Curated annotation (Swiss-Prot):
InterPro entries: aa-tRNA-synt_IIb (IPR002314), aa-tRNA-synth_II (IPR006195), aa-tRNA-synth_II/BPL/LPL (IPR045864), Ser-tRNA-ligase_type_1 (IPR002317), Ser-tRNA-synth_1_N (IPR015866), SerRS_1_N_sf (IPR042103), SerRS_core (IPR033729), tRNA-bd_arm (IPR010978). Catalyzes the attachment of serine to tRNA(Ser). Is also able to aminoacylate tRNA(Sec) with serine, to form the misacylated tRNA L-seryl-tRNA(Sec), which will be further converted into selenocysteinyl-tRNA(Sec). Its main location: cytoplasm. It comes from the Bacteria. ATP binds at R272, S273, E274, E359, I360, S361, S362. It comes from Glaesserella parasuis serovar 5 (strain SH0165) (Haemophilus parasuis). Pfam families: Seryl_tRNA_N, tRNA-synt_2b. GO terms for biological process: selenocysteine biosynthetic process; seryl-tRNA aminoacylation. Consists of two distinct domains, a catalytic core and a N-terminal extension that is involved in tRNA binding. Homodimer. The tRNA molecule binds across the dimer. This is Serine--tRNA ligase. PANTHER family: SERINE--TRNA LIGASE (PTHR43697:SF1), SERYL-TRNA SYNTHETASE (PTHR43697).
Amino acid sequence: MIDQNLLRTNLEEVAQILKLKRNFNLDVARVTSLEEQRKALQVKAENLQAERNARSKNIGAAKARGEDISALLTEVDTMGSELDAAKVELDKVQAEIRELLLNIPNLPADEVPVGKDDSENLEVSRWGTPRQFDFEIKDHVTLGEGLGGLDFPAGVKLTGSRFVVMKSGIARLHRALSQFMLDLHTEQHGYVETYVPYLVNHDTLYGTGQLPKFGEDLFHTQPLDGQDPNAVQKPYALIPTAEVPVTNLVRDEILDEESLPLKLTAHTPCFRSEAGSYGRDTRGLIRMHQFDKVEMVQIVAPEKSMEALEELTGHAEKVLQLLNLPYRKMLLCSGDMSFGSSKTYDLEVWLPAQNTYREISSCSNMWDFQARRMQARCKAKGDKKTRLVHTLNGSGLAVGRTLVAVLENYQNADGSITVPEVLKPYMGGVEVIK
């Protein structure tokens, strides 16, 4: 959520930035009207409160003099009713303002390039050289099915499209990847491993910005057909990313600045409806309703967040480098960033079968956007004032897409897969999956 004071002091400028950089039309007239109503009701409530307090003091003095106070009591009661009504109206207007604020995207950092979509992202760097094959390249689906490790029909039978069952060496490789990532981040990058719920409530989803704008992208709990109609329905949603529960651990907290940065990592399944992705990546593991991800989250002091973004992105890059997977680093343009981000780097891994780079990690500085929604603050020692923290998150990495990259980049002519060197300790001595 952006700072409401920005709308009060620089409304036209903010509206222009949102239009230019986010293609978002801020309703300036509505914002102005609501702010005028808020001010008027605030003044009215304050005046009524002051007058009521003054009349209440008069009642005490009149009573001490033995005077009839019935008229004064009536006046105070009337003012009390008017004050209550004004407060109700003020709360209503403030709720409308908050709802409006919750639907406004974050303002991009100054260095973020202006652009409409991913075609205008900027390549920052590349690492590694794509392997040259002397045999016909197979995609990960052909490889996985040939090894008996990817069973998409079973996923359809159990649940539906965009689900998969993994078996044998492929399932173990998938597990090895997540363990390797967690070990790297906790042992070398300073993150604390965290286990979190996979179901979260309404407040948690508001805190990180999934609600109210992106409810259709979530899987919500509800009774199945034929279930007892008297069953209690729990108002939960499955997490779309571990960013949601992990970041919300600091919701409504005041952290000691000396304890920052707070660096947390979690391996979880993620659940997404892919509501806007109909017809895209229908083959294979690239776009699933359920996939695993190792997430990195940092909570930092405001002046440290841009430095932290470079560090966090470097941690994601290290995973790819140790796996010897070629990738490129992209700075997202304003039109391709997520709703709550102020600056984002995407890492795109080389997939030989597609002959292109595909996103495998997104690392974002959310600035104080999430912190304001969550009221996550910090305070320096000896300082009475608090300030909002800055939050960052990044994939370190998406496990399923990393599996895709390993299968395709480490394939052999006979359809077997050579296990990357750094994963061998996690594979129980298996060096080739065949």
